[in-house]
Amino acid sequence: MIYDVLEYGAKGDGVTNDAAAIQKAIDACSQAGGGKVLLQGGHVFRSGTIFLKSNVEFHLEMGAVLKASDHLEDFDMLKVGTPQISKVDTPTYNACDYNGKPTLNFVYSKDAENVAITGFGKIDGNEKIFYGKVTKWHIDGYFYPRVPLLFLENVRHLTIQQVTLTGSAFWTTHLVGCKEVLIEGIRIINNLRLANCDGIDPDHCSNCLLYTSDAADEEDS
């Protein structure tokens, strides 16, 4: 079954924060046993944090853009340094300079299964609102909070296909403790002057298959 976010109140006008409408569609899809949450082409959906849930395919049609909000208050905050992970020994983020996991998240999932992000649309992290000091050659990356584009914890049977991921202010695809992962045919296009906008970071994951994907980013493709 298809759950079109426009039918759940999303505007797709590039201005309105559509997070609540998108989340409503995701919740309805998961609660009904699963299906496809659709973002139609020709629309820009501005959004704060969204939570992907079990048995949901999050599908962006060609020409659809999910773009991070300009306002930090639209992103849900996690407690820095608080144990949040399930069934993972020591995630890499525990050793990061910011002393814990990312405090803010854009596209997030935790303790879920059968999650997919698909389609030829685009997810844009709106990097410019997170810039530190900008010089001729470099943009300071040692400032927080910054928002990773995709942050997925303890997700089993995870698929990411075809989508373009761009404008990430921090790690683009951070997978923590995920199992049975397929990443295929995606494009990652980030600012080569912005520090720490890694491409794909499998962190304590198992059975990951990554292929036929392109990444242009400043660090750790």
Model-derived regions: residue spans:
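Conserved small/polar residues in nucleotide/adenosyl-binding loops
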Residues: 211-216
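Acidic Gly/Asp/Thr-rich repetitive segments characteristic of extracellular carbohydrate-active
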Residues: 5-39
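All-beta strand scaffolds that present successive hydrophobic residues in beta-strands
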Residues: 58-61, 116-119, 158-161, 181-184, ...
